[in-house]
């Protein structure tokens, strides 16, 4: 079997990095980098219209719950084909935007940087598609002492298939790495 490399597509964007509070001078809290993966949706069974703001995602909130600070080191949206993708191709519109953008899943292709991807069919039947987050166009801090309004948000739209399907053609997820620091002092819970 041939090893297939993911198709990596870079989103065109306007360089407009978010601003954040500068760290205090002197010694900083130790930090660690941890991986994460969030399942967004299966595609090809019904219409998908999704908005995932990383700073308020429940999976990431659980991962960062015992830390005061969390920032994105790297992140990507990934489209994985499933076993039915060669016979039932599906398309998905994707864009990374700051969370205070007025863009919505239905306006992805009217927004600068919006992309349409086809998963399945004769050309991309077994290809994984990677869509990296451009950290120079959003604020990478998803948890801090203050709330930021420009943290990353992924918009996704995939129409319902023309014929009813029971098995998804593809899956969409977000994965990457977070830098966590400034541990919160919490009580130790004991089991009863």
UniProtKB/Swiss-Prot annotation:
GO molecular function, a single term: structural molecule activity
Primary subcellular site in the record, as a coarse category: virion
One Gene Ontology CC term in the entry: T=3 icosahedral viral capsid
Protein name: Capsid protein
Species: Ononis yellow mosaic virus
Segments of this protein annotated with the region Disordered: 1-30
The organism's place on the tree of life at top rank: Viruses
Protein function: Self-assembles to form a T=3 icosahedral capsid composed of 180 copies of the capsid protein. The capsid encapsulates the single-stranded RNA genome.
Family the entry assigns: Belongs to the tymoviruses capsid protein family.
Subcellular location as annotated: Virion
Lineage of the species this protein comes from: Viruses, Riboviria, Orthornavirae, Kitrinoviricota, Alsuviricetes
Polar residues: compositionally biased ranges: 12-30
Presence of keyword RNA-binding: no
Entry keywords, A to Z: Capsid protein, T=3 icosahedral capsid protein, Virion
Pfam families reported for this sequence: Tymo_coat
